[in-house]
Amino acid sequence: MSKLSHSEVLNTIRNGLIASCQPVDDGPMDKPEIVAAMAQASLIGGAAGLRIEGVDNLKATRPTVKAPIIAIVKRDLPDSPVRITPFLQDIDDLAAAGADIIAVDGTDRVRPVTIEAALKRIHELGCLAMADCSTLAEGLYCQQLGFDIVGSTMSGYTGGEVPNEPDYQLVKDLKAAGCFVMAEGRYNSPRLAKTAIEIGADCVTVGSALTRLEHIVGWFADEIKTAKV
């Protein structure tokens, strides 16, 4: 954990960019030391905070940065579609490794641990709690429970075709309801990230467009292939 108080953490990331340093799974950059380097480079570039997946990656990154870290663990479970920080042990491990904010799946889906139990554990361990939601109803429920941050993270990712654009309406609605809002999900250009802040997001997380080199190169390569020469 950084040496910032909870209010200082929120003030530090307010109106700022959160760099999600999550390399492609099992890719050449999927190494804790590389994730830590990504995090440091992101802060040099102007990020206000970081989102780090995995306990080992968090352990490698925390000693190298003072900025707030949102931490998660992703798992693929046989009996639940929930992937983001599904177990209390994940929360324990992330808190011990230095997370400032722990994010959990806030969707209304079958899960191994209730959202209420996850929130209780996060706060007991002295961390701020973030809910990754997909709908306004989920976000409002998590706000009422006492989550410190509500994210649009899961919008478009709980079934059906994934949209191309971010869910601006969800961000607006969450803000109108009084949430501390993290815009997240498909904010893959500076213009889109700027728009998120302009419509009311307290901060915005960007991932693939910053730290997934395979994806970024692919965007360029695919576009070049369509060039008329």
Curated annotation (Swiss-Prot):
Upper taxonomic lineage: Bacteria, Pseudomonadati, Pseudomonadota, Gammaproteobacteria, Pasteurellales
Protein encoded by which gene: nanE
Name of the protein: Putative N-acetylmannosamine-6-phosphate 2-epimerase
Entry function: Converts N-acetylmannosamine-6-phosphate (ManNAc-6-P) to N-acetylglucosamine-6-phosphate (GlcNAc-6-P).
NCBIfam families: PRK01130.1
Family: Belongs to the NanE family.
Enzyme category, top tier: isomerase
Record field: transmembrane: none
One BP term from GO: N-acetylmannosamine catabolic process
Native species: Actinobacillus pleuropneumoniae serotype 3 (strain JL03)
UniProt keyword Isomerase, yes or no: yes
